[in-house]
A protein has these predicted regions:
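Extracellular and secretory-pathway beta-repeat/beta-biased strand scaffolds
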Residues: 1-745
Length: 745
């Protein structure tokens, strides 16, 4: 064929195959024919392969082809700003070890799956390989691809695609970017991966992002027409960065579809998601959603970035699993439409289906500046009043489990929301369970850990759900060596209406400071509901609250019953239990809305019904060393002088005496006045740091014949092996301080 210079410069066959690839120039369409077929595999080989904006690279394959395997053997990267197209349901592999960039107009028009990779070769089941760096004539195979082999320095992959062919958008009303057909796989496997306001869409299918290091091998495990990507032979990973300019030009990764959704897997060393956008997976119909799995050394979400799974139909939402040594969820940002986007990880049901679970396995988790991690039974906006009237969901929320071996920090707030871990319900669905297992937990500066049931009303104050069928608050279980709640930090399981949930804390040290709160109160809007239970088990540890800083442990019900508070601890300091009478007396009012220990400056424990004394709850405190509610011990008016022996009992072979020596410096009777003249002004003197005797005579050992008596120990010393030895004589010592010498002793 006769090719233009532009065509030759962009798509150039390298003539290394038994049957060479041919490129036909048909206007803005570059028709790719020929190539070498082996069974259901069709091989193409190019020296250069790039597609300009507005152009189409059309692989004109026969419909019986299963895999189109395309390699680039030259030294330049592939820049795809147009469309890649193929016939039938063939899968398309694009292999360029120099790098691949998808521009803002890049799109896919293929019936099968797409794998874009910067691997150096692809390996087949029979052991053969198709190499992009060793372009000699290969022995082509009819075998199935089983792996991607990378070189010493895998090149990056960039996606900037905001393509919307025929105006199509995804569920979030954003451009689809690179999109495959429903049920198919979209995979980018390379070195560093960048999504720069670029989106990936695979409705009901699978999205795979893998960032691998030098000499890695990624296994392709065939399934029914697709693959599972396995990284067991990868020794090190590279980084993935997902950024969004704004809401209109955001990076979205989604497999959401009308009848379900697929799976999303992202794996790398450092994974960063910045700006409004992220990884989003919803099922919109009756089928269940797929799962989201993130594997990383460090994961960061910031400035409104989100990883969310959910359901807007009857189908069950997918599970979200994060495995990363460090996880940071930071802040949020205002969008160009002037609403606040929260950085969040979560799972939500908006309608009838149950939400999936969220599991985070890490060493350290930090949620700061208004970031959220949430599982929720939420609601959906009614079409006639978007963002105003919410029809509550009936599906149940999922469970949230945090396993952080070292540290969990929930700290701070944004202008719109507090940093939080939460499992809540807004309607008839039940809230999920929230579990935190960590070495150290810090909830500070307005941070919250909460489960609960909340009521959302419309613009005229009406609740649109079933008021008589409200979901239950979930339970909250925390196990940590130490727990610090500080500066308006909260751990709560509260309800606006209905039954409060339960809180169980297992710890060795619980510290509460500056308006901190642990609460399972119910009926927050002055309605019915029983307070939940609080169990704090610090059997070998301590509970320490700063006095007069309004730190409270509460299990109150407004018109329902108070809950139970059970505390097992070795010591309880700075906080005391108050009953109804105590609260009324201290607050100075018996108004039920005022009988609340949070209105006091003291640190208190309370489990009452605010309206009905017969429904008060129970506070049980076991084995405290200090009972702060017992007050001071009364001393006798005339103290007795007891006879006390502080040494061995004297035998008849010794003489014993007790003397008080001095110039009335110490009174012999506690009723005698201590006058200021009894203690003279005396100077301190320095003593040389040398070996010296005490200023009394060392006792002499006396031998008694035929008397087998016990000699009272006069001192003790430590042998070199750590053994403590009692001695009958006082030792020589080296003083380390300046002793006080009274002038007249």
């Amino acid at each position: 064929c006769i090719l233009s210079n532009t065509c030759v410069a962009q798509i150039t066959p390298d003539n290394t195959l038994p049957i060479d690839t041919r490129v036909l120039n048909q206007g803005e369409t570059k028709v790719i024919e020929g190539g070498t077929q082996a069974g259901k595999n069709l091989f193409h080989s190019f020296e250069e392969f790039s597609v300009l904006g507005g152009q189409t690279a059309y692989f004109n394959n026969s419909v019986n082809i299963q895999n189109i395997i395309t390699r680039v053997t030259g030294k330049s990267s592939s820049n795809i700003d147009g469309t890649l197209r193929s016939n039938g349901a063939a899968n398309l592999f694009l292999i360029n070890s120099n790098g691949i960039t998808f521009g803002a107009s890049a799109s896919l028009d293929i019936g099968g799956s797409f794998v874009g990779t910067t691997a150096s070769s692809i390996k087949f089941e029979d052991g053969s390989k198709y190499s992009a760096v060793e372009p000699q004539t290969p022995l082509l195979t009819i075998s199935t691809p089983i792996g991607l082999q990378f070189g010493a320095n895998p090149a990056p992959i960039r996606n900037q695609s905001q393509a919307s062919p025929n105006g199509a958008t995804n569920y979030y009303n954003s451009p689809e970017g690179l999109r495959v057909s429903p049920g198919k796989t979209l995979a980018l496997i390379g070195g560093d991966i960048y999504l720069e306001s670029g989106s990936l869409t695979a409705p009901l299918g699978q999205i795979e992002l893998g960032s691998v290091g030098s000499n890695s091998f990624v296994n392709l495990i065939p399934t029914s027409g697709d693959w599972i990507f396995e990284y067991k032979d990868v020794k090190n990973f590279k980084n993935i960065q997902i950024t969004s300019k704004n809401l209109s030009n955001s990076s979205n990764i989604t497999t959401s579809g009308q009848s379900g959704s697929g799976n999303i897997h992202v794996i790398g060393n450092i994974i960063e998601i910045f700006g409004v956008g992220g990884i989003l997976n919803l099922t919109l119909g009756d089928k269940d959603a797929g799962d989201i799995v993130i594997d990383a050394n460090k994961l960061t979400l910031q400035d409104g970035a989100q990883i969310l799974a959910g359901t807007v139909g009857k189908g069950t939402g997918g599970n979200l699993t994060i495995n990363a040594s460090n996880v940071d969820v930071l802040g949020g940002s205002y969008t160009e439409f002037d609403f606040f986007a929260i950085s969040a990880i979560g799972s939500t049901t908006y309608k009838d289906g149950n939400a999936g679970n969220v599991n985070i396995n890490t060493k350290t988790l930090r949620v700061k500046d208004g970031g959220n991690i949430v599982v929720e039974s939420s609601g959906i906006n009614t079409p006639e009043s978007l963002f105003k009237d919410v029809l509550p969901a009936t599906g149940n929320a999922g469970n949230l489990t945090i396993n952080a071996t070292q540290l969990v920090e929930i700290i701070g707030k944004s202008p719109e929301t507090n940093s939080s871990l939460s499992a809540t319900t807004l309607g008839s669905g039940n809230a999920g369970k929230l579990t935190v297992n960590t070495g150290k937990l810090i909830v500070n500066n307005g941070g919250e850990i909460k489960v609960g049931s909340r009521v959302i009303t419309n613009s005229i104050g009406k609740y649109l759900g079933d008021r008589f069928n409200l979901g239950r608050a979930g339970n909250l279980d925390i196990t940590a060596n130490s727990i610090l709640i500080d500066n308006q930090g909260k751990i709560t399981s509260e309800t606006d209406l209905g039954q409060g949930g339960n809180i169980t804390l297992q710890t060795q040290l619980l510290q509460m400071r500056r308006n901190s709160l642990i609460s399972t109160s119910a009926g927050k809007i002055q309605s019915s509901g029983d307070g939940g239970n609080i169990i704090i088990n610090a059997r070998n540890g301590f509970i320490v609250a700063a006095r007069n800083q309004n730190n409270d442990i509460i299990a109150n019900g407004f018109s329902g019953s108070g809950g139970k508070i059970i505390i097992n601890a070795s010591g309880i300091l700075g906080i005391e239990a108050l009953n109804r009478e105590d609260l009324i007396r201290k607050i100075g009012s018996n108004d039920p809305s005022q009988i609340d220990p949070q209105k006091l400056s003291t640190s208190d424990i309370s489990a009452i019904s605010q309206t009905n004394a017969n429904l008060d709850g129970v506070v049980s405190i076991t084995n405290p060393d200090v009972d702060s509610s017992s007050g001071l011990v009364n001393l006798p008016e005339k103290p007795n002088v007891p006879t006390i022996t502080q040494a061995c009992k004297a035998d008849n072979t010794r003489q014993n005496k007790f003397s008080i020596v001095g110039r009335r410096g110490l009174a012999t009777n506690p009723t005698e006045f201590l006058r200021n003249t009894t203690i003279p002004d005396t100077d301190w003197i320095s003593v040389e740091n040398s070996t010296m005797q005490y200023p009394f005579q060392q006792s002499q050992t006396t031998t008694y014949n035929n008397i087998n008596s016990v000699i009272e120990a006069q001192a003790w010393k430590v042998d070199k092996d750590g053994t403590i030895i009692l001695t009958s004589t006082a030792p020589k010592i080296i003083p380390h301080s300046k002793p006080f010498v009274a002038p007249a002793c």
